[in-house]
C-alpha cells in the first residue's frame, strides 16, 4: 500500500469565516483503491473540508492535488466533471423523475438533436450490472426505498468515471442486509481503483470497511493511521481531546414501582404489532431491540396515538388511558422523540426558540392569542442550559446546529410537557461520540428523576451499555424480555429471528 501514489491530496488547508477559523492547516491523503475514513465530532471540520474540495467554499490557503495535478474547483459540477463526486446523507434527487433522468440529467447522450435513449439505458444497465444493483432504470425515484435511491447516487458517481467518491453517513437509514450490499459495492469500487472518503460516526463500520483513518478536532488535523493499528478507544480519545474511559456513563439509576403496563397491544392496520405486553418501571431504561422491519417503532407510535389500535390496554400509574391521538398522549403524560429528526422532529429553517416550544405552543399565548415572548425565552433558556445545547443564540436557525444539539433541543422540548414516560426512537442516530455520551447521561439522569424511559436502537452496544432490560421484537411480536446484565448480543440476535 505504501508504494501507491495518492489519487487525492489535500495539503495544509485553512478556511476562515468572520471570527472563526473553521480549518487550520488540515491534511488528507487518499490512495486509489482504498477506503479512507474521515472522523471527528460534529463541528470538527469534516463538512467544511469537503466543501473546500468541491468548490462550495473557497479555501484561504493550502493545495488540492488530483492525480498529482493541482486543482481548484469552483463548483460541484466542475468537481464531478473531473472525477470527484459525493453521495450525500440527505439524498439530492428529483423524486418525480425516473432513475435514468436522475443519473444523466444535464448530460444526456445525444443522437443528432435527440436524446439517445437506447445508449442511456444500456450504459445504465452496464453500471448496474458491475455494481450488482437490481433496479428498473425506468422506475420513478419516489417509488424506490432509500437504500435503492442511495445505490442510484453511487451509480451516478460511477457514470462520471469518478476517481474519488465521498460517502457521507451512507448507512444511517439502511437495514443490516442493505449495509452488506453497500459494503459489497464499496469492495467492487475499491477493486476498480476508486478512492473512497467515508464519513461516519459508527465505530464498528469504520473498523470493518476502512483502510486508513484521519481524525479532525476543532478544525485541526489530529492523526492519520492504518485502521488496523488503532483501537476504538484511541479514536474516541483523539476525537474528543480527552480520555473517555468508558463509551457509556456509569449507570446509577434504580428501577422502582411500575409506571406503565401495556397489555396485548395490537395495531388496527396489519401487518404490525400483535399482542405486545410489557411493564415499565419508574427509574428504568427499557430498550427495544429487533431487526429492521420487526415493528419496533410501531409499538411507541401506537402507544403515542399516532397509529390506531385494534385492542389492548395502556395503563399508566394504575389507570387505563386512551391515547387516540398524540394530543391525548401528551395530556396523559407521554412524550415521543421520533426516529426521523430532520423530517418530523425539527423545523430546520426556524430558530432554536421556536423549535424549543412548538410541542405546546398554546401555553405561550395570551388571551389575545399573541405569543408571550418572555415565557418562550425563559423555557428556551432552560432547555439550552439543562440540555447543554451549544448554540450561538436562541435566534439561530436550528438547521445550522449539529445533529447532537438538534436532538438535545427536541428532548428538552418534550421535557417541557412534563412527561412521565419518555420514548426515544433511535435517539443517537447520526450524531457524534461525545454527543451520544451526553444523551446517554441525560437518559440516566431522567431515569433518576423517576421517569420511565423507552429507547429503540439498532446499535447493539448502545442497548447493552445504557438499558436495564431489553424487549426484543420479531415480526411484530415480543420474542422475549431480558435483563441487560444477564444477556449478550448473540441471545438478542437469536430472539430477533424467533418469529421470522
UniProtKB/Swiss-Prot annotation:
Subcellular location: Cell inner membrane
Domain ABC transporter: 8-243, 257-500
GO molecular function, one term: ATP binding
Record-given protein name: Galactose/methyl galactoside import ATP-binding protein MglA
Predominant location: membrane
Major enzyme class: translocase
Reported function: Part of the ABC transporter complex MglABC involved in galactose/methyl galactoside import. Responsible for energy coupling to the transport system.
One Gene Ontology cellular component: plasma membrane
Higher taxonomy: Bacteria, Fusobacteriati, Fusobacteriota, Fusobacteriia, Fusobacteriales
NCBIfam families, per the entry: PRK10982.1
Encoding gene per record: mglA
Membrane topology field: Peripheral membrane protein
SMART domains given in the database record: AAA
Amino acid at each position: 500500500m505504501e508504494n501507491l501514489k495518492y489519487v487525492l491530496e489535500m495539503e495544509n488547508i485553512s478556511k476562515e469565516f468572520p471570527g472563526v477559523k473553521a480549518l487550520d492547516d488540515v491534511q488528507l491523503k487518499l490512495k486509489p483503491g482504498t477506503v479512507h475514513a474521515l472522523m471527528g465530532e460534529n463541528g470538527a471540520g469534516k463538512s467544511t473540508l469537503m466543501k473546500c474540495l468541491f468548490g462550495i467554499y473557497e479555501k484561504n490557503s493550502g493545495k488540492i492535488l488530483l492525480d498529482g495535478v493541482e486543482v481548484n474547483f469552483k463548483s460541484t459540477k466542475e468537481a464531478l466533471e473531473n472525477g470527484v463526486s459525493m453521495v450525500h446523507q440527505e439524498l439530492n434527487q428529483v423524486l418525480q423523475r425516473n432513475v435514468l433522468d436522475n443519473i444523466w440529467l444535464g448530460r444526456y447522450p445525444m443522437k443528432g438533436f435527440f436524446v439517445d435513449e437506447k445508449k442511456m439505458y444500456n450504459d445504465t444497465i452496464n453500471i448496474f450490472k458491475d455494481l450488482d444493483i437490481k433496479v428498473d432504470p425506468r422506475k420513478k425515484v419516489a417509488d424506490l426505498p432509500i437504500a435503492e435511491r442511495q445505490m442510484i447516487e453511487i451509480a451516478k458517481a460511477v457514470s462520471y468515471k469518478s476517481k474519488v467518491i465521498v460517502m457521507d453517513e451512507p448507512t444511517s437509514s439502511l437495514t443490516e442486509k442493505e449495509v452488506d450490499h453497500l459494503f459489497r459495492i464499496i469492495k467492487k469500487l475499491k477493486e476498480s481503483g476508486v478512492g473512497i472518503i467515508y464519513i461516519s460516526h459508527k465505530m464498528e463500520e469504520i473498523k470493518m470497511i476502512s483502510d486508513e483513518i484521519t481524525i479532525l478536532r476543532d478544525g485541526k488535523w489530529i492523526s492519520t493511521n492504518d485502521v488496523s493499528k488503532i483501537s476504538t478507544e484511541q479514536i474516541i480519545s483523539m476525537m474528543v481531546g480527552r480520555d473517555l474511559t468508558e463509551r457509556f456513563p456509569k449507570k446509577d439509576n434504580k428501577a422502582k414501582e411500575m409506571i406503565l403496563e401495556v397489555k396485548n397491544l395490537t395495531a388496527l392496520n396489519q401487518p404490525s404489532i400483535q399482542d405486545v405486553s410489557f411493564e415499565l418501571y419508574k427509574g428504568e431504561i427499557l430498550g427495544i431491540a429487533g431487526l429492521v422491519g420487526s415493528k419496533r417503532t410501531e409499538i411507541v407510535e401506537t402507544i403515542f396515538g399516532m397509529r390506531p389500535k385494534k385492542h389492548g390496554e395502556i395503563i399508566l400509574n394504575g389507570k387505563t388511558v386512551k391515547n387516540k391521538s398524540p394530543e391525548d398522549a401528551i395530556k396523559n403524560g407521554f412524550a415521543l422523540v421520533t426516529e426521523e429528526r430532520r423530517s418530523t422532529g425539527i423545523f430546520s429553517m426556524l430558530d432554536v426558540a421556536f423549535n424549543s416550544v412548538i410541542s405546546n405552543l398554546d401555553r405561550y399565548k395570551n388571551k389575545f392569542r399573541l405569543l408571550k415572548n418572555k415565557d418562550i425565552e425563559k423555557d428556551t433558556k432552560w432547555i439550552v442550559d439543562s440540555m447543554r445545547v451549544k448554540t450561538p443564540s436562541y435566534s439561530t436557525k436550528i438547521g445550522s446546529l449539529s445533529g447532537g444539539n438538534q436532538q438535545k433541543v427536541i428532548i428538552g422540548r418534550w421535557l417541557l410537557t412534563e412527561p412521565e414516560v419518555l420514548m426515544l426512537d433511535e435517539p443517537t442516530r447520526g450524531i457524534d461520540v461525545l454527543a451520544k455520551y451526553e444523551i446517554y447521561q441525560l437518559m440516566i439522569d431522567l431515569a433518576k428523576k423517576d421517569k420511565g424511559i423507552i429507547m429503540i436502537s439498532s446499535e447493539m452496544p448502545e442497548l447493552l451499555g445504557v438499558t436495564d432490560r431489553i424487549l426484543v421484537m420479531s415480526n411484530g411480536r415480543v420474542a422475549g424480555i431480558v435483563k441487560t446484565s444477564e444477556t449478550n448480543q448473540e441471545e438478542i440476535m437469536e430472539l430477533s429471528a424467533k418469529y421470522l
